[in-house]
């Protein structure tokens, strides 16, 4: 099954006093992966965000299996787990990339809800067509 890939090199600013990556950065990278997916695969959604579309994160998780440190090269692989009504659930795998190969270091999940600003209110709306179509090729089932 195909995955959207986002590559990242860990910087010192992402590590803690001990020298490993601070856990919250894994969630930031999920968001960055999602943003790059929109840029690369669904640019019309970025335009819709300027006109009231809101993508609200409703759930996020990450399970850690190994530490990352500065200058580790990480490949995030994002797949569509579920798409229904106005909600999208994505699965993420974090792979440390080295000359010797790859090591799975974390897994995550994120759910977003598509909403539309209407004055003071934010109302649920269906997942935009371009996003729905772009995500299909990355579905897990």
Positions of predicted regions on the chain:
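HotDog/MaoC-like acyl-thioester-processing domains
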Residues: 6, 64, 68-70, 81-141
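Hydrophobic beta-strand-centered segment that forms part of the acyl-chain substrate-binding groove
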Residues: 37-88
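Hot-dog-fold acyl-thioester-processing enzymes
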Residues: 1-57, 115-141
């Amino acid at each position: 099954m195909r995955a959207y890939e986002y590559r990242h090199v860990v910087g010192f600013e992402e590590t803690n006093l001990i020298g490993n990556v601070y856990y919250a950065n894994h969630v930031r990278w999920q968001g960055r992966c999602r943003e790059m997916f929109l840029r690369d695969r669904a640019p019309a959604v970025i335009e819709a965000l300027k006109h009231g579309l809101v993508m609200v994160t409703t759930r996020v998780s990450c399970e850690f299996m190994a530490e990352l440190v500065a200058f580790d090269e990480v490949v995030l692989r994002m797949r569509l787990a579920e798409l229904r009504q106005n909600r999208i659930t994505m699965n993420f795998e974090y792979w440390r990339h080295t000359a010797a190969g790859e090591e799975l270091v974390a897994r995550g999940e994120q759910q977003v809800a598509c909403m539309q600003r209407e004055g003071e209110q934010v109302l649920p709306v269906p997942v935009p067509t371009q996003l729905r179509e772009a995500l299909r090729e990355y579905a897990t089932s």
